[in-house]
Amino acid sequence: MLPTTSAMPIGAIIVSARPADDCLAHFALTEADLLRGPVLDCPGGASDFAVRIRALGGRAVSVDPAYDAHPERFAERLRADLERVRAWTATRLDRFPPGPDGRWHRLPSWEHAAETFMADYRRDRDEATGHYVSALLPTLPFPDRTFALATSGFLLFTYPDHFDQAFHLGALRELLRVADEVRVHPLNDSARNPYPHIAALLEALRADGVHVDTLAVESPTDRSDTHTLRLRRPALPAGCTE
């Protein structure tokens, strides 16, 4: 039997333009949380999340392998991926209800986020701000504990057909190497299937001394994405440095 349309994942990895407000909801964060220290968004995609953090007075770096592209090439891919999102959500109206124009009602906010991101991405390329770094998990070009917080949305657990269990563990350990706290959302793929190896991953992380818990969230994107993983490194003893 073939799976139903709703049960089929989105397929190839997309560069998504998730709005900053959605990211706050996904990761169970407040704007005040974003000012505790430097923030890493990995993968950053075309979200305006890091732009919001900097507008608030915080520090943020976005990492994505797509950032090796010239802005015009990036914009071309972004337009294509937004069209993929439009087409995919149009066949799943029970999960992604349409707005007045017949498209998924959240798509205009994605398009606005994409415009904000592209303006900032072009500025980064013109001024070498260092806000957008091309890199690929599980190897990040930052020293240990560079960031107070790392957020990782819609990559880990979302594409189990692209990344095996070893990749997931390596990626989580690398995020924990560079950040004191890591939040990952969601814990299922785009067809709502829970990640099958999450128990084994969390057991391995606990063995590393990582504090693990899950946070209940309400996703503005898909109401089935109800949990976020929070990982915290053990604090260094007083007077110790790495």
Would you name each region that the model predicts?
Residues Y159-E174:
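A short, conserved alpha-helix within the catalytic core of class I
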Residues A128-L140:
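Conserved SAM-binding strand-loop segment of SAM-dependent methyltransferases
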Residues A55, R59-G130:
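Class I S-adenosyl-L-methionine-dependent methyltransferase module
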Residues P138-T151:
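A short acidic, Gly/Pro-enriched loop at the edge of an enzyme's catalytic core
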Residues G153-F157, H185:
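Residues lining the SAM
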Residues M1-G37, D48, A55-L56, D68-R79:
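Class I SAM-dependent methyltransferase Rossmann-like catalytic core
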Residues A171-N188:
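Conserved beta-strand signature within the Rossmann-like core of class I S-adenosyl-L-methionine
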Residues S190-E242:
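Class I S-adenosyl-L-methionine
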